[in-house]
Structure formats: C-alpha cells, structure tokens
C-alpha cells in the first residue's frame, strides 16, 4: 500500500473511531476540520481541486462503508433526539460578547461557574505571538481555525453561526 492510500486508510480509521464514539457533533466537527486541513495542505502542495475532491470522496465513501453498521442506528437516534425538534433560536444560543473577558479573567460575570473560555494571559500572549513570529501558512491556518471556532461559539450572536447553520451539511442538528 502506497503513501497516499495509507494516508486515506488512516483518515478513515480516525474518522470511524470518532463516529463510533457516538457523539455526532464531535464527529461532525472533526470531519469538517480534517477536510479543511486536507484541502489546505493539498493546495499548499499544489494539488488540483479535482485531485482533492477525488480523495475526499474516496475517504468519505470508505468511511460510510466502514461505519455502515452504526450508520442506521445513529440516524435513528438523531431522529428521536429532542435536539432535532428544537427551533433555531434555541440551537443558536451561545456565549455573549462580554464573555471574551474570560480569556484573561476568571470568576467574571454570568458564566463564572465553568470559565469555558479561560486561556490566561501567558497562553493568550503566546498564541498571539506565534503567528507573526513564525509567519508561515500553517500558523495562519490554525489562527483562522481558532478565530472561526471562537466566532461559532457565540452562536446566534454572530452572523457566522447563521451561515454555518444554513450552509454546512448537518450543522443544523447542533
């Protein structure tokens, strides 16, 4: 088995394990990020869109075959889930913009129980210094991923969530 096929097999294995874990939202986010990173790396190495889309199709076809034993129960579970009947307004709940203070301050405001956004001053400083100091495409890609992920956590308080909800496949479930 050549390098390209072993990479495809590895991708299928990672995605299948994620799917079999039974947390559909996590699987979906891993699949989105893995696909985006594959496209990024492929475009950086000069691969054509046809080549990239062909490899993505192969990986997801093999993934469907490997995970088919769990696919029907998972679809049934999703159809019975209460989340599928929730209105957009309920699904679009997210952080409020004031929660950004939690990056550097704990025990602040209405969500002071968990501090889900806390990074700390050192962590935030190192993250912000990494991109300009390295200046390579990979740093810019991961900074973009972090920004998109952060904006999506604000749910309906930011327009990007609305776009993702209506455009990305299966994103409307979460």
Report residues per predicted region.
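Periplasmic/ER-lumenal interhelical loops and adjacent helix-loop junctions
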Residues: 52-132, 162-174
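Membrane-interface helix caps and helix-loop-helix hairpins in membrane proteins
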Residues: 19-28, 110-111
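Hydrophobic transmembrane alpha-helices
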Residues: 1-2, 14-18, 33-44, 128-129
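Hydrophobic alpha-helical membrane segments of integral membrane proteins
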Residues: 6-11, 24-32, 144, 161
């Amino acid at each position: 088995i050549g390098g390209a096929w072993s990479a495809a097999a590895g991708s299928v294995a990672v995605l299948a394990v994620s799917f079999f874990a039974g947390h559909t939202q996590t699987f979906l986010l891993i699949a989105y990020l893995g696909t985006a990173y594959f496209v990024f790396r492929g475009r950086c190495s000069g691969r054509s869109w046809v080549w990239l889309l062909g490899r993505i199709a192969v990986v997801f076809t093999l993934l469907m075959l490997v995970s088919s034993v769990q696919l029907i129960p998972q679809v049934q579970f999703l159809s019975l889930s209460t989340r599928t009947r929730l209105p957009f307004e309920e699904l679009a709940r997210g952080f409020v913009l004031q929660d950004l203070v939690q990056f550097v301050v704990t025990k602040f405001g209405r969500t002071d129980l968990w501090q889900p956004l806390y990074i700390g001053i050192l962590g935030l400083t190192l993250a912000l210094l990494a991109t300009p100091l390295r200046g390579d495409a990979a740093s810019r890609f991961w900074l973009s991923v972090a920004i998109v992920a952060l904006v999506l956590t604000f749910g309906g308080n930011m327009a990007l969530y609305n776009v993702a909800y209506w455009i990305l496949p299966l994103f409307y479930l979460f």
